[in-house]
Amino acid sequence: IQTGKYVASPGCHASGFIALVYPLIAAGLLDRGALLTATSLTGYSGGGKKMIAEYEASERSELLKGPMPYALGQSHKHLPEMQKQCGLENAPVFVPVVGNFYSGMLVTLPLHASLLKGAPSSDALRAVYKNPYPLGLVHVSGEAPSALYANAYAGRDDMEIFVSGADGRLLVSALFDNLGKGASGAAIECFNLMRGAPADAGLTLG
């Protein structure tokens, strides 16, 4: 990025997925041929002006009060990016879900420990995630939450990774703002790096 003339920042869903999967592959814990599934819960701002207008209309459908899984035909536009940037041999089964809130995103990757070399503990996974992200914009929580709110990082430009689960059934989750670290915040971060500024210059962090 520092020496690039043109830099493309990743899509919002892809940002969370890549942040969770790539470090596992780079560390040799996850095979590139692994068959993965992921869900991503996003605020309705991710759907652009048309969807924002639908959700904020004075007379809107009652159906919009509930979560809406979409792209069920496995044709989401971020899938090729997710597969390519992680070096996966197979595209994941991906379920994006729009929620009744403006912004925020929670990407979750369920993993059986048997998929990971050596069946690492939750603490070992947290250590893996700490190594690739030295710029201070991706944090790794030391806690194992029993619940996460997808809009908790709305208005922020950083990301937090959580590891939870038990009995060999693990969940790794990326919590961030689809409009921040998932969009404009990531673009500003890249611009900062290209011009030799601190990565977090002008960004809103927790």
Region annotations inferred by a language model:
Residues I1-T37, T42-A57:
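Glycine-/Pro-rich loop/turn segments that contact NAD(P) or position catalytic residues
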Residues G11, G43-G48, G104, G182-G185, ...:
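Glycine-centered flexibility sites
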Residues I18-I25, L79-Q83, R126, F162, ...:
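Predominant activation on well-ordered alpha-helical scaffold segments within soluble catalytic domains
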Residues L29-L30, L88, A197:
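Helix N-cap/coil-helix junction residues
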Residues A34-L35, T39, Y44-S173:
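C-terminal substrate-binding/catalytic lobe of Rossmann-fold NAD(P)-dependent oxidoreductases
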Residues D158-G206:
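NAD(P)-dependent Rossmann-like dehydrogenase/reductase catalytic/cofactor-binding core
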